[in-house]
Amino acid sequence: MPVAIGALQRHATDHQMEHEVVSGKPLFARAADTGRHVAVVGAGPAGLACAHTLALSGHRVTIFDAHDKPGGLNEYGIAAYKTVDDFAQREVQWLLSIGGIELHARRQLGRDFALTQLREQFDAVFLGIGLGGINALHADGETLAGVLNAVDFIAQLRQSDDLSTLPVGHQVVVIGGGNTAIDAAVQSVKLGARQVTMAYRRGAAQMSATSAERDFARKQGVVLLEWARPLRIVGMLQAGSSDAHASAVQFETTRLDADGQLEGTGETFCIKADVVLKAIGQTLVSDGLDAQLLTLDGARIAVDADGATSLPGVWAGGDCTNHPALDLTVQAVQDGKLAAHAIIRQFARTVAKAG
């Protein structure tokens, strides 16, 4: 049986936070102020880990985040059924309690400030901006009523005080093969959907969702459909409305050709659906970045092993970067820590040269 690393980390963190409340003895103590000031863009796992590590070493940190609440995907991107005790905000407050970290909410890169400004005003910059864009399905009917982004669906659920008041489809089709697709599918079942199908264009072995997540979804009643890609979303006029609403999804069965490339078989079928949730990945939103100077690798920010970008004094980590690992919270946290230590070393070299 695989080791439940996430559950173990959750238990250890909860235990430590509770211990500090009882004992009054914090685990971490901040070093004396160094006079250095770092900007962190994004209050998700990568940004918070970077900020906390920098603050421990005595550097001041200002975090800018576009949302109302800090936490990133831990606050907005994990299904409500997995987060029953407001752990994301408790953990954020625990991290910020070390001191030396100032948080500015509702401050968005590209809208309220640009990377150029941060480079002028701070000694270093860390970008933990995640992936704010949504991949298009490129299928007819994508704009019909009832077709939603799974990420937005989950975020709405997480910020709702009463899940029973939220509308849910009777027949839901989730398109995608990652953990977001699993979350959206299972959450739909728990909200009362009669039939939930999760469709993926390849096989289970190619899904980024873990086998444990897939098994859990099946046990909850989700039907996992492999080797099926959406061709179009069928719309139908509803009584009292002039706008068409999703009523079914037409799929084509797929397979791998002799070269291992995905191809359609020409065989098609339809699944009824009054709600279609797209969970086919996210993209980098480059607004506010120095795109002409900041090197991108494909659709993400290119970084070295320490998280350094092509711009001097700018580091990045988490989902927005091109690291080869999976887009997991634990990887984002590690990215933030590694970048923070690289920034600390850079500051030390600067002091040594000045001396």
Predicted regions located by residue number:
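A conserved FAD-binding loop/helix module that cradles the flavin
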Residues: 184, 320-351
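Rossmann-like dinucleotide-binding cores of NAD(P)H-dependent redox enzymes
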Residues: 63, 67-97, 103-104, 185-232, ...
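Iron-sulfur cluster-binding cysteine motifs and their immediate structural context
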Residues: 1-12, 62, 69, 100-101
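Feature captures the FAD/FMN-dependent oxidoreductase FAD-binding
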Residues: 32-41, 89-139, 232-250, 275, ...
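Residue-level detector of alpha-helix initiation sites
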Residues: 44-45, 69, 178-180, 321
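N-terminal Rossmann-like FAD-binding beta1-loop-alpha1 element of flavoenzymes
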Residues: 37-62, 181-189
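FAD-site-proximal beta/loop scaffold in flavoenzymes
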Residues: 143-169, 259-326, 330
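Glycine-rich dinucleotide-binding loop and its adjacent helix/turn
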Residues: 8, 12-32, 93-106, 111, ...
